[in-house]
Amino acid sequence: PYLKESTFTGGHGSFEIPDYNGFRLPFGKATLRRKGIQPDNVFCCTLTGDSMEERIADGAAIAVDTGDNAIKDGKIYAFRHDDLFRVKYLSRLPGGRVKIKSHNEAVYPEEEASLEGIQVIGRVFWWSVLD
């Protein structure tokens, strides 16, 4: 499903709550399965903010695989952090910590947080925007 009224932010976080409206993006189920993604684990929404630019533009549609929520260093994840919905690169650190990194590092410095304070929703595996 495409959660049209929902946004994740690449900036400092968003309080938007998912609300499915029936709209779907054209991912073929067979294509997703070939990539090891179960179609029932996928949702799409909009990313707002410039912290992931040049990689993912403000306003891009993103696809999230909720079945892939174990952190693999350097991958992009949708996650909840202190009740904010965010999209960033995540990497595990020693001592039960996680590194939170934006693509636009000049504006958004790297952060660290406790793994306990992070709820990984899923890995962002696709994005698209028309400019």
Regions found by a protein language model. Give the residues of each.
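Short, conserved beta-turn/loop elements at beta-strand boundaries and strand-helix junctions
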Residues: 92-97, 129-131
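Short, surface-exposed secondary-structure edge patches
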Residues: 51-55, 67-70, 115
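SH3/SH3-like beta-barrel fold
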Residues: 79, 100-102
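Short, positionally conserved secondary-structure boundary motifs
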Residues: 1-58, 121, 126-131
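Amphipathic alpha-helical interface segments
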Residues: 102-131
